[in-house]
Amino acid sequence: MSISEGEDQPGASSNRTARRAIDRSIASLAIPALGALVAEPLFLIVDSALIGHLGAEPLAGLAIASTILQTAVGLMIFLAYATTPLVARRRGAGDLRGAVQAGIDGLWLALGLGAVLGVALWAVSTPLVGFFGTDAGVASQAVTYLAVSCAGLPAMLVVFAATGLLRGLQDTRTPLFIATLGFAANALLNWWFIYGLGWGIAGSAWGTVAAQWAMVVVYLVVVTVHARRHGASLLPHRDGLSSAGRSGGWLFVRTIGLRAALMLTVAAAASHGTVATAGYQVVFTIFSTAAFALDALAIAAQALVGDALGARHAERARQVLRRTVFWGLACGAAIGLVLAATSPILGRVFSSDPEVLTVLPPSLLVLGLSLPLGGFVFVLDGVLMGAGDARYLAWTSLVNLAVYLPVLWAVTVLVPTGTIALVALTAAFTVVFMAARALTLGLRARGERWVTLGV
């Protein structure tokens, strides 16, 4: 054995040990986070299943109302993403009191925004539903569900912020537990209110609102325990609210850019007719499902990177970057291979329409082949969020949108309707748009400007 070989072995062993430790940390955060992410859409699935037995009008009303609600709530997801790095940095710096306080400030911000959003949405619920141009019966059902659901908006946003607090403390198991309880309560209350009390679609909305506020109560108990343990105040601090507001504002801009890309892609699909729109809905549903696994890795990256930078361990933050990118690519490739292999038959799960089934397989193949790129993007997004690089994420989301728009215009205007249209739409979003995001995120991650140490 040479001297150099003898010297390299301890270093190699140390690197392997570090990688394994980071991998264990990633798994301990990502796996429960995945469970909590999967639980969230189950609320709507339960509502759909129960309301569907009331007839076509209530189900159509739910479709419209839930679209409005999901759009409004989706724009507020920054409350979780902004709170996590603020808490994680302070935890990494050893300031657990400050970490919990930052999370509590986020809760108050969420409550205030939720109250304003709830009142505003309630006030315009009728004209918003009217925008969809449905008949009077469906519109009435939609307005009923939407108006009642507005009472739960503050609770939904508080849950976002509380989840972000616990993620920052590297606790993803408690959110999974609370989400599971909330799902069970939602199912039972909805059944009772809809069928036991005969409240119809309003009963479904009230059941969900009650479950959401019950989740808030449980979260507040958990947060109070943390506050008392570490000496944090349950009242908001002005500086903390300002900090959360600044970070959240930039992440809100980022979310606007992403939502605009999604909505414009749907509009492009609609321009190619019913078959393309239905096919795109199937493709996007599968993409969203695959994204749960990739988003769970991004959540782990947020918490671990924020903690490492708060502790002034730049190399550990880079190690987290490397390992989460590895797992993002690996998970994307694994899911993509399964999707590509099943692309000829997977569409039958979602549709029995012969035309839709004809256009789906090539598009699902494109989606499967693009998922490693998606894994790369999701993870780097989480890394830069954890680093608190919100301003960069905001501006580049607008740049990415600007790059995407001409491509989407070309797909809308120049591509003929049919199978090629759906393939082009799928490639535009999952390849072109994701490649633009990969470039802007990758360039940032290769540099050092995101590595800001301390609190």
How would you describe each model-predicted region?
Residues 45-49, 127, 161-165, 187-192, ...:
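Alpha-helical transmembrane segments of multipass membrane proteins
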Residues 59-119, 159-175, 279-343, 376-388, ...:
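Small-residue-rich hydrophobic transmembrane alpha-helices
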